[in-house]
């Protein structure tokens, strides 16, 4: 037993201040600008020689993609990737380490640590990008995801809808190393990690620009509505929306369990086939949230798209769809509009005034201040009808959600799918980009405000110093003599002559 104990490795214990937060034993979350404070205690069961102790805060992305072969004789393979995008080191005072470097048996050595979670990564974390927008997105701190032992909300462990092929983790790591006598190689005597859940503050970004040929999103659709299966046309129905405000989740360590909500506004336009046709009776409108996770084993230079994953074997895609609500819209009120002279004139030259029906930028497709969609392709300048539908959106409480983000290997994006039924055979659908953002923690918000104020004062001081030490001209002022003008009495003839050619000629008459 003594010989077995002598072979024991040093015991490392990592304690983190406030690690359980307001939810008891449930692991707490930390946000950007939050401070991680704690202590590392190391106890050796016997005298142990070492050379270095490393305490660091590490962020890592891990992915894998299975490669399936269609050939029966070829086995499928798997490619994987790991990216350490963040590593902060805690300096250790030399006086806290024993000299010589031998941990005495039974003695406990304590090392405090302090880390501040940064708002963004260092530039070296992303070396491959196609433009500054991609780089800026990749340098944002990604959230913890893919670990069911720490994901949750409101004190409950919940599914964060991440596939096993992608994981982002943070941890405080401690390594005790020694240089091997035989070859000088650094070997690890013992190491230990403590998981930390990071939920960074994420601000809302500008709405996504959706083109007419976008396969992932659609903000406008129009369809022909018929009177019956074998009957004539009733008219054209246009369904249009724009990207709603983001769903904003509470900050880290928040006790707020209020519903996370936003709303989407859908605008309908009906262009009747003739003046006698009335708007169709609306059916139900269902809303679903599509949660999409993109992952890759090679760094990406662009924002991911669904079609890319079908062509590039190093990329993968995983999606889950959550039902949000289903509402009857039969009571929607239609508003009748008489076309203006400009709208009637536009029908005579649609090539100039009407854009492709697939274009989804509502700032261009809306008609004036009334937010009326542009006419359908078959609009002939007749009376038309519009209706507005307000769709409330609320995140389910049986899942947990991470903010929208893009990193070199992993991305998480969300989409709102809206489907409006008109009859048993006709429906219109929209695929709307939707952002999920996150508030700062109270500590992080306070730290950010102090930092912004300090930076503002520093900029003012630098501007004042620049003004003080700015170079000044010591040359005499330039005097411009007029080429013409009245001279004092008696000096008319001795006035300075005007310039001639490129030189200045002066005539002086001596008065006697």
PLM features: residue spans?
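A surface-exposed loop-and-adjacent beta-strand signature within N-terminal beta-sandwich domains
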Residues: 1-160, 165, 173-224, 303, ...
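Intrinsically disordered, low-complexity Ser/Thr/Pro-enriched regulatory regions
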Residues: 1-31, 35, 73-89, 116-118, ...
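Low-complexity, intrinsically disordered activation/interaction regions
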Residues: 170, 174, 192, 283, ...
């Amino acid at each position: 037993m003594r010989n077995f104990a002598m072979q024991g490795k040093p015991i490392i214990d990592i304690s983190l201040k406030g690690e359980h937060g307001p939810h008891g034993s449930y692991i707490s979350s930390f946000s950007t600008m939050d401070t991680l404070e704690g202590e590392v205690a190391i106890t050796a069961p016997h005298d142990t020689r070492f050379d270095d102790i490393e305490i660091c805060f590490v962020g890592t992305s891990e992915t894998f993609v299975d490669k399936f072969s269609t050939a029966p004789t070829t086995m499928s393979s798997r490619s994987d990737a790991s990216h350490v995008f963040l590593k902060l080191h805690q300096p250790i005072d030399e006086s806290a380490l024993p000299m010589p470097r031998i941990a005495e048996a039974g003695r406990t050595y304590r090392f405090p640590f302090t880390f501040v979670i940064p708002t963004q990564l260092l530039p070296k974390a992303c070396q491959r990008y196609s433009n500054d927008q991609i780089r800026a997105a990749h340098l944002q701190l990604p959230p913890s995801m893919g670990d069911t032992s720490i994901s949750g909300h409101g004190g409950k462990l919940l599914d964060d809808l991440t596939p096993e092929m992608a994981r982002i983790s943070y941890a405080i790591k401690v390594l005790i190393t020694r240089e091997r006598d035989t070859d000088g190689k650094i070997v690890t005597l013992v190491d230990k990690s403590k998981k930390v859940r990071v939920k960074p503050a994420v601000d809302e970004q500008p709405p996504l620009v959706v083109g007419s040929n976008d396969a992932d999103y659609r903000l406008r659709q129009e369809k022909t509505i018929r009177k019956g299966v074998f009957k004539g046309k009733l008219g054209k129905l246009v369904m249009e929306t724009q990207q709603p405000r983001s769903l904003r989740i509470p900050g880290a360590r928040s006790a707020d369990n209020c519903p996370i909500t936003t709303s989407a506004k859908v605008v309908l336009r009906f262009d009747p086939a003739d003046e006698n046709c009335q708007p169709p009776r609306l059916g139900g409108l269902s809303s679903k949230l599509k949660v999409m996770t993109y992952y890759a084993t090679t760094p990406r230079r662009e924002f991911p798209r669904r079609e890319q994953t079908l062509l590039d074997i190093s990329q993968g895609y995983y999606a889950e769809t959550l039902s949000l609500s289903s509402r009857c819209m039969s009571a929607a009120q239609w508003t009748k509009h008489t076309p203006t002279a400009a709208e009637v004139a536009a029908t005579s030259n649609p090539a100039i005034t009407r854009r492709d029906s697939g274009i989804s930028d509502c700032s261009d497709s809306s008609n004036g201040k009334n937010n009326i969609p542009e006419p359908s392709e078959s609009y002939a300048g007749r009376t038309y009808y519009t209706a507005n539908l307000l769709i409330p959106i609320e995140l389910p409480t049986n899942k947990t959600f991470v903010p929208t983000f893009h990193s070199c290997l992993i991305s998480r994006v969300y989409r709102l799918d809206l489907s409006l039924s008109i009859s048993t055979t006709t429906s219109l659908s929209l695929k709307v980009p939707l952002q999920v953002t996150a508030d700062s923690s109270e500590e992080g918000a306070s730290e950010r405000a102090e930092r912004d104020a300090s930076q503002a004062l520093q900029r003012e001081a630098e501007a004042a110093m620049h003004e003080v030490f700015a170079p000044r001209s010591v040359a005499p002022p330039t005097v411009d003599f007029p080429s013409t003008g009245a001279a004092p009495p008696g000096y008319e003839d001795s006035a300075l002559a005007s310039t001639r050619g490129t030189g200045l000629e002066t005539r002086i008459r001596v008065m006697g």
